[in-house]
Amino acid sequence: MRWLFWASDNDKDGCKCNSKSSSSSDEKPTAPLKSNKDWNSLSNAINWSHYAEPSNLIPTVLLTSGILFAFRIHRRYLRRIPEATNISPSYLRQRSILGKVTSVGDGDNFRIYHTPGGMLAGWGWLRKVPTSKKELKNNTIHIRIAGVDAPELAHFGRPSQPFGEEAHKWLINRLTGRRIRAYVYRPDQYSRIVATVYAYRFLFFPQDIGLQMLREGLATVYEAKSGAEFGGPEQEKKYRDAEALAKKKGKGLWKTKGSNDWESPRDFKSRMNAIDQGKDSST
């Protein structure tokens, strides 16, 4: 509406100011907008080309590659395997295990403490193999020698087989405290790992333990309907030839081959199993 003529200019100005102040008080204050220029200005301020210079890039790449390479080497070659059940399937028929013999169970099996890397990794001069039963518990790999069957010792109420003690003593003298290399093939039903075993009598002259036992007449070639393991046809032929020669010479357990009570280790175990089954059925 039009202002009355007697209204002064000061009143008009006051009204205008009041209306403006009231309207401005009703409006909500707006927060200042964040400028996305902050990050851009920061990133632009960094001299990224400095990191692409060969003097900085090459050492970084070399250091990263070295760390990754060292990790791979440790994981593949220097990581210790505590027990036979911890052996990765990728090892079987592909890799060998180096270790020190801690005990011999009977004529064809024993335990080793895995020493990955051998002397180059410090075993024997910087790192010691434990000797106490407490330290060795759950820390040794149980190995079954592949391709051979030694005469049985007395155990589980069963009698000892002829030449069982001789085979056991021979293996103790040949292996206890020695470094061996085992070419692993597969686990057996007793949580052992079946392997061809080489013992180091001298630094560069490994000896095939299974083959030597056959030559001495202290074991026969492993005979079973299933589960026989030699590591290949060539190895099997070598073992059978050694057994045939020992048999021909009448060495070890072959001395009494012509007698009526002669039994191979396989026949002895089969007879003992039949006796045990007969006892179970009678009870």
Curated annotation (Swiss-Prot):
Coiled coil: none annotated. It is an enzyme of class 3 (hydrolase). Residues 95-256 form the TNase-like domain. GO terms for cellular component: membrane; mitochondrion. The chain crosses the membrane at residues 57-73. It is a single-pass membrane protein. Its EC number is 3.1.-.-. This is Probable endonuclease LCL3. It comes from Arthroderma gypseum (strain ATCC MYA-4604 / CBS 118893). The lineage of its organism: Eukaryota, Fungi, Dikarya, Ascomycota, Pezizomycotina.
